[in-house]
């Protein structure tokens, strides 16, 4: 987008190559259906649409091109070797790479301010909040309810993206704190197929980091000012 080689409303066409099973709804549409890039990017994050992810992989030059770009960004553990859903687990990444990719965007090292804002908007659409957000809420204590709303009441916001292939679960996100500062967290757990202990471990790890994300109380500032008047 920043280089002008892709527009946010450019249509991407559904082909047999990119249709992926599993999560998402785009695979159910007829071949030849065209989706604007902004919808594809949003659905990739919002509902983890595998076909949407494949559409973007194809449009951005394919697996080898993306892998070279990941390597140039210092994401050495991240490699795309197969189209999604990749149930065999041939694609790879690390918690460090997940955290670094978010940090690169948030610090402005990888994207312009406008593209960074688009990134945040899209990340904010993710509907899965049962791992990192739920764990953080648990660690903060107090009222426990729906994670996003309950965190917002406490002054926190988590822009996160989850992923799983049954034997591995991940959640990474940008955490906005009550004092305006931000933090990045990423978790990646491998375990037995569909083992609930994997997701619970992510929640426990997120809860354990909560104490260090509690900002120091702000010093109250008086709005009153004193003035002397000569008689």
Q: Where are the regions that the model predicts?
A:
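A mature extracytoplasmic/lumenal domain signature
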Residues: 12, 16-18, 84, 187-189, ...
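Short, mixed-charge aromatic SLiMs
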Residues: 16-28, 72, 121-133
């Amino acid at each position: 987008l920043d280089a002008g080689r892709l527009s946010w409303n450019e249509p991407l066409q559904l082909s047999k190559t990119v249709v992926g099973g599993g999560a998402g709804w785009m695979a159910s549409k007829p071949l030849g259906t065209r989706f604007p890039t902004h919808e594809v990017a949003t659905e990739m994050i919002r509902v983890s649409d595998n076909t949407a992810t494949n559409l973007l992989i194809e449009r951005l030059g394919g697996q080898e091109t993306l892998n070279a770009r990941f390597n140039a960004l210092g994401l050495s553990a991240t490699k795309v070797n197969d189209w999604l859903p990749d149930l065999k687990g041939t694609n790879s990444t690390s918690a460090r790479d997940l955290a670094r990719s978010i940090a690169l965007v948030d610090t402005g090292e990888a994207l312009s301010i406008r593209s960074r804002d688009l990134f945040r908007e899209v990340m904010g659409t993710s509907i899965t909040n049962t791992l990192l957000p739920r764990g953080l809420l648990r660690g903060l204590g107090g009222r426990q309810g729906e994670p996003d709303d309950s965190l917002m009441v406490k002054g926190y916001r988590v822009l996160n993206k989850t992923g799983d292939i049954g034997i591995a679960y991940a959640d990474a996100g940008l955490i906005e704190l009550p004092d305006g500062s931000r933090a990045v967290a990423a978790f990646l757990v491998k375990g037995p197929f569909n083992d609930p202990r994997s997701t619970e471990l992510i929640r426990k790890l997120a809860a354990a980091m909560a104490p260090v994300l509690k900002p120091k109380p702000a010093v109250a500032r008086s709005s009153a000012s004193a003035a002397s008047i000569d008689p």
